[in-house]
Amino acid sequence: METLVLSNILHFESGEDEYLFHGLTGNILKLDDVAKEFVHFAKELGDRTGDSFHVDASRYLDGRAADHRDMLEELMQLEIVNPAGRFSATPLAPKQTEKLPVKTLVFHLVNECNLRCTYCYAGDGEYGAPKKYMTMETADRAIEFLMENSFQEESVTIVLFGGEPFLNWKVLKHIVERAVEQGEKWGKKVHFSLTTNGTLMTTEQMQFLHKYQIGTSVSMDGTRVAHDKNRPMAGGQGSYERVSKNVAQLVATHKSAPVGTRVTVAKGFEKLETSLAHLLSKGFYEVGFAPVTETDQDLALGIEDLNELLRQFRELSDRYVEHALRNEYLGFSNLTNVLKELHMGTNKAYGCGAGLGFFAVSPDGGLFLCHRFNENEQFRMGDIYSGVDRNKQRQMLDELHVDRKESCATCSLKHICSGGCYYEAMERQGDYRRPNAHYCDWMHQWITIGLQVYVRILEGNPAFLDTISGTGKERCVSN
């Protein structure tokens, strides 16, 4: 046998068992004694590059029984082991972008906000541009653009965003009603989601969200002290009291779609268990924790902060398993998202859908790579009048493809992470095309936790994974 490559693997333990996660195929293998022996041999005596190991197969098989050769052949069939120089296929960058449908459009209803959050990437909601409000005429054209450019897609998604979208309530209401009308005309189901700071919602607006089944995310940072620390009103006073009061009414009124919350985690963050318990007690369906992207040293998470965040993520993950084995859902959405990707065998060539089927539309109709790049001319991708700049889209997708990121080539997370967020890469690495190297070690540890949780739930209550993923089928761990 020739030199073989045990490629893109994450070797982990759960209880007394050992497993392999293969980052190119998404396969998860429970290792028997023969496979364990090979993996340990590869890690100890093979030539390592990233998460891949070159192994002299003849040396390994010398003196070993036939079942070791059978095991290698099985791993080769699964493409976890390959002859040197050959790897499992990666989804290619699209060559004919004209055929790519637009599936999701983020509507920036207004470049303005009534809060002054310390960590806001949008610069008080203005994105470095003059204050702008989307008009009904622009909204109508954006809806028409989405219908036309979604091609044969049976459903599309509209994200209602800002700034603070409720500052432009009349247009928000018009967008939803008009999109539903146009969806019926075009034979498409329109899904809606909305992100808000929660300070301005009225009873009428909450009833509207319920009527149109609008998935709603309220930005809230935990208890009063934690929230008011970084999310003051424009006048300087805390916003917690107003948000808390509105959330209580919102979750009582809006029953047709999940109401979740997003916590921005900055330096000096509140204990996550405290934040999670507090926010779930408010009636939120689930809570997501997002490390701040701000590079200011007073806000950014350092290595010690990230390690502490990971430690607390592990604690919450253990609680999540306890609930899942009782067939209960603990609304820790960071872990839910990882479990969904593992269960569905996610194989991403890009960090996200930005520029593929996902765009942001500015108040005046410009199309941008995503909502974080709103009003940034470098990332203008056309407009709703002349359409997507397909040449720029093709160039951008070629540049952003994970195979362009050399340091990702042998990584076990190649098709889960795919280099991460483009905006954060620009902020932290100075180049949107580079992988988020500052999070690599952290991501490996976090996904390892996710894998350990996954196999525990799969063995104890596999139906739970089907439920949260909406797959209707069980994705098994191979023995």
Language-model-derived ranges and their functions:
Residues 1-43, 472:
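Acidic, low-complexity/disordered tracts enriched in E/D and polar residues
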Residues 38, 47-61:
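Short acidic, hydrophobic short linear motifs in intrinsically disordered regions
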Residues 63, 67-70, 74, 78, ...:
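Conserved alpha-helical substructure of the radical SAM core
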Residues 121-126, 256, 412-416, 426:
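Detector for the c-type heme attachment site
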Residues 139, 143-159, 168-292:
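Radical SAM/AdoMet-radical enzyme domain recognition
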Residues 143-161, 396-400, 434-479:
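Short Fe-S-cluster ligation motifs
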Residues 308-341, 371-418:
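C-terminal accessory region of radical SAM enzymes
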Residues 398-449:
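Cysteine-cluster motifs in flexible loop/terminal segments that predominantly coordinate metals
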